Amino acid sequence: MIVALLGFAGCATPAVGDPCLPEQVPEGGFQQTEAYIESSSVQCQTRVCMVYKLEGAPEGTPTCVADRTKCATAEQVDKAVYCTCRCDAGNSRFANCTCPSGYTCTPVLEQGSEGVRGSYCVKSFSVSAAE
């Protein structure tokens, strides 16, 4: 019976919300009107690192080092850059996750390959602020 319960507990959404930093930061930093998905992120148990509507570049990245006016604060990065999972892949053959409490399944990518298109778990306060 314990094995069955442990197996069920393993189905929870792993590490959504954990901090991460994408390996690639666009020249000039991120744009607040965009969301960025880095799949195959080794920093995330979910393998997906998302930048959701962040303006600028995280501290220590080449863009921020070259131009301090392009830097995002640590608080801004904490709110907008984190591990996530895809919660709705549409009619795709790919699996979906269930968003944990405090996150909303939100359409993020409408273009791109079938492997990344769809909705992702986004911090609920970010979705409310955008509406």
Residue ranges of model-derived segments:
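Sec-dependent bacterial lipoprotein signal peptides
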Residues: 1-10
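Secreted, cysteine-rich disulfide-bonded mini-domains of extracellular proteins
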Residues: 11-131
